Design a protein with these regions (language model features):
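Short loop/turn segments immediately following the C-termini of beta-strands
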Residues: 83, 91-92, 163-165, 171, ...
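Beta-propeller domain segments
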Residues: 19-59, 97-99, 105, 109-113, ...
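Surface loop/turn motifs at the tips and blade-to-blade linkers of beta-strand repeat domains
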Residues: 67-72, 139-146, 184-192, 245-249, ...
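C-terminal motif of bacterial Sec signal peptides marking the signal peptidase cleavage site
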Residues: 13-16
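Asp-box/WD-like beta-propeller blade repeats and closely related beta-sheet repeat scaffolds
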Residues: 134-157, 162-203, 215-218, 242
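Blade-loop segments of beta-propeller domains
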Residues: 97-153
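Conserved beta-propeller blade signature
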Residues: 85-87, 157-160, 208-212, 264-268, ...
Length: 442
């Protein structure tokens, strides 16, 4: 381990010798894309954990934030049940072998910014019957799972996307646990599992399920034969399990959600590494049926990646650009649209995005929750920092946001923090008319 650490330090210094412009705008519908800067190893910097202590994340004036659960076991995504119970999926997955020395080094660097807690492989239920932000009940809702991540409820059927299977459970309203056996709707690609998370959403009418399956590599270096059914979004028939890929070349679709105005499917996507600190921006996009988003042959439409082998100019010619850039290497892992008018005012239509934070650029990016305004079902402005403070003044990480979830009946935003193993709750503290311009508070 000492040798790995020393090698990582030396190569990180080497990779930091070059740079790309740091002031190019990289959010919104038309991000500026600098020239490629491939390197032996990417510039790597991770914010080492320090914990929250007696602090908490920072929210704008007019809002309050509190922890509704602590000491979880790697919380990822969440789901609100019709009675207001909050489900939290907890787990760690992935078992991809390291192919190259830089894979070992990158793995070591990334491990410095993660929790030492073992994943719970469970779904925890939090019941806050009076809505005061302090749950009266916390219990294991479903145990003995295999790295659960995405969840969706259709009627009285609860669907859970594990790293290797989509499962269905019978849900009884008001129940505090499920002990009956699951039904496997369909197996999910799990060989190697370079990107293990399986995001999940249900169509607006509940007839279809959508699962996001990430690639098995950064840019195809394991060979394209192991990328079968990877870097795709599957549409799955809820009753039969029959599935098809509705979008391809979408490197790592880490969260899926239905946009409520148009009922369109949207995703946040983690793009590729090792082309420099300003390439390639992660993004938010509508998932279009039949669209090819470029991976691994191109990015942001038809910008060719020379590292992909074999080259496929025929596919590049069909590649579509995503809708909205979030910034390079922010690691967007959470997506939730507001419904019911949201918080009103500037927060009446749009999406919350949880940005887990970078590991492969010298200036840290992400480590926050942003708000993306929408109008008429489309992004309509620049992203706005909403919940910050995950990086302290000393540059260390207090937490790292993953899933985000807006609970319309209670006008609350929940944030899963998998570094401090906390779920946070953001609510209006005063009228939101003043919240749009106020100074941040902790």
């Amino acid at each position: 381990m000492i040798r790995v650490a020393a090698t990582a330090a030396a190569l990180t210094l080497l990779s930091a010798c070059g740079s790309q412009p740091s002031d190019v705008p990289q959010t919104g519908p038309n991000p500026q894309l600098p020239g490629q800067q491939p390197s032996l190893i990417p510039a790597m910097k991770i914010a080492k954990p320090t914990g929250w202590g007696d602090t908490r994340p920072t929210v704008p004036k007019g809002f309050a934030i509190n922890a509704v659960a602590t000491d979880l076991k790697v919380p990822r995504q969440m789901l609100v049940l019709p009675n207001g119970d909050l489900l939290v999926a907890e787990g760690k997955g992935g078992h991809a072998p390291k192919l190259r020395p830089k894979d070992v080094i990158a793995g070591y660097i990334k491990s410095l910014g993660t929790t030492s807690v073992k994943g719970g492989d469970r779904i925890t239920l939090l019941r806050d019957a009076d809505g005061d932000g302090r749950p009266e009940l916390r219990t294991t809702f479903i145990g003995k799972l295999d790295a659960p991540y995405g969840m969706a409820l259709v009627g009285n059927e609860l669907f859970v996307a594990e790293q290797g299977a989509l499962k269905r459970f019978d849900y009884v309203p008001g129940a505090t646990s499920i002990t009956t056996p699951a039904v496997v709707v369909t197996r999910l690609p799990s060989r190697i599992n370079h990107h293990w998370t399986k995001s999940l959403a249900a169509s607006a009418d509940g007839s279809k399920l959508y699962v996001g399956v990430g690639s098995n590599s950064n840019v195809g270096e394991r060979g394209m034969e192991v990328e079968q059914d990877r870097a795709v979004v599957w549409e799955i028939d809820r009753q039969t399990g029959a599935h098809r890929a509705i979008a391809t070349g979408i490197r790592n679709p880490t969260a899926l959600a239905i946009e409520p105005v148009t009922n369109g499917l949207w995703s946040v996507v983690n793009e590729r590494d090792e082309l420099g600190p300003r390439l390639v921006p992660d993004y938010l996009t509508q998932v279009r049926d039949g669209a090819f988003y470029g991976w691994p042959y191109s990015y942001y439409g038809r910008n060719v990646d020379p590292r992909a082998h074999p080259q496929r100019p025929d596919l590049v010619a069909t590649a579509v650009a995503p809708d909205y850039a979030l910034g390079s290497h922010v690691a967007a892992l959470g997506l939730s649209f507001v419904t019911g008018g949201g918080w009103g005012g500037a927060f009446s239509e749009g999406a919350f995005v949880g940005e887990h934070g970078s590991w492969n650029r010298q200036d840290l990016a992400g480590y926050k929750v942003v708000w993306v305004p929408f109008a008429g079902g489309r992004p309509s402005g620049e992203p706005r920092d909403l919940v910050t403070g995950f990086i302290g003044p000393d540059g260390k990480a207090r937490g790292r946001p993953v899933g985000v979830l807006y609970d319309a009946p209670r006008r609350a935003l929940f944030i899963a923090d998998d570094l401090s193993n906390t779920v946070w709750r953001v609510t209006p503290a005063v009228t939101t008319a003043a919240a749009g311009t106020g100074r941040a508070r902790g």
